[in-house]
Amino acid sequence: LPYSIVNVHSGKHRVSSSSSISNDREAEITVDLVLKLRKKALKIGIITFYTAQVRLIANLMRAKNVVPAGSDDDVFASTVDSFQGSEADVIILSCVRTSKTSAGFLSDSRRLNVSLTRAKKKLIVLCNADALAGGGETLEMLDLKSLIENAKTRNVLFSESEPKIFSSFTASSSTRFWTARIARRITSSSTTTPTAASCHSRSSTRLDA
C-alpha cells in the first residue's frame, strides 16, 4: 500500500473536558489534505483514535465548507473503533498524541492494525514523528518506529510545511509490502478563516449540515 507520513512537529495535543484528546495542527493539515484530495473524486476516510479529534476535524471541515450537505459518504471522519470493517480510497490517520512518555491508543495492537489496513489506494499518517521516535519499546511502538525509518529511506516522510505531502498516488511494490508486513506483525501481537482553535466548542461529529 502506498503511504506517506507527515511529521506534524509543531502540533501539541490537548485534553478535553471529556478526557479525550485532540491536536489542532493535525486537524488543520487534515482539512488541507481533504481540500486537495477531493479534486481527485476519491472516497476519503479520516480516522483517529480519539473522539475529541473526530469532533474537531468535523467542525473545522464544516466551518471551511469543505463538505456540502449530503456528501458525507465521500468524506467522513470516524474513530478507529467505529471504522472497523470499512474502507476508503484514501485514509488520513491522525495520531494526535505528541508525548514521548505515553503512546496511549497507539500502543493498542488491534486499533493500530485497523488504522493501517483500511486504505485502498493511499495511507497518509499524521503524527509527531520526533515524539514517536523517542517513545516506548513495545512491539507496536517498535513497528511504528520502523515504519517511520522506512518512510525516511523511501523519501515519503515529509515535514508539515512541505508541499510534497500532496504528491501523487505512486509507490514502489516494496513500499506496499513494507506497510503490509507491519500490519501483519501488529495483528500477530466565516470572513475570518476558521481555525481548529475556533472549532473546539462545537459538539456535532456529523460532516453534513
Language-model features: locations:
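Helicase C-terminal subdomain and adjacent C-terminal extension
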Residues: 61-63, 102-208
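Conserved RecA-like helicase motor-core motifs
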Residues: 43-45, 62-79
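Switch/connector loops and helix/strand junctions flanking conserved nucleotide-binding motifs
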Residues: 14-16, 55-57, 86-88, 100-103, ...
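Helical mechanochemical/support elements of P-loop NTPase systems and associated helical scaffolds
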Residues: 23-29, 53, 84, 108-111, ...
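Eukaryotic intrinsically disordered and solvent-exposed regulatory patches
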Residues: 32-33, 76-79, 109-112
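Conserved helicase/translocase motor-coupling segment
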Residues: 1-59
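A short beta-strand element within the Helicase C-terminal
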Residues: 78, 86-98, 114, 122-125
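Conserved helicase motor
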Residues: 50-51, 77-83
